[in-house]
Amino acid sequence: QMCIRDRFYLKHPEFEPDQPFDYSFSKLLSPLNIPPKNCGVGTDILIYDTDGISYPCHLFLPIVHGQNEVERILKDIDFHDDASLINDKCRKCLISNICRTCYGYNQIDRGNPQNRNLSKCKMQLAEAQVISSFQIQYYIAKKEHLTANEVLKLKAAIKCYELVHNNVFNFN
């Protein structure tokens, strides 16, 4: 299915690609020591329970963890500090700036919002390879008519492609 869609967009560059081909790799253009949080948990998102008490996300509600456990969990998490939401292994990853995770499921499944599901690393890497390769082809096909934003997207896709094709990733 994805091959059909990417061939369509390559034959018809007048159409804007949609998901997943429109993924932005622009965060890779800025060297960041600490990757930015990839969702609004605790900062841009608030969820309210039936008593009007706010929580950082629906996965941190008392109905999920129990009231006492939620209070214990939340007192140890600073959702405004991106560095506190990534572990050392992920911090060293070359594409951590574009890695997506769910901090709520990290807490539920692995006991800490920092502890990402490392079984997804290979999938995220494969996705980055395929999408960056597509974007390079797509933007080069319409190179005479690129906007400034599209030039930026092309540069970011090239950066991603170079990172994922020229490096060895340790999944252990």
Labelled PLM ranges:
Residues 2-4:
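Short, small-residue-biased leader/transition segments that mark boundaries at the very start
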Residues 88-172:
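Radical SAM enzyme core and accessory elements
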Residues 20-126:
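Accessory C-terminal segments flanking Radical SAM cores
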Residues 16-20, 148-149:
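Short, flexible loop/turn segments with low-complexity composition
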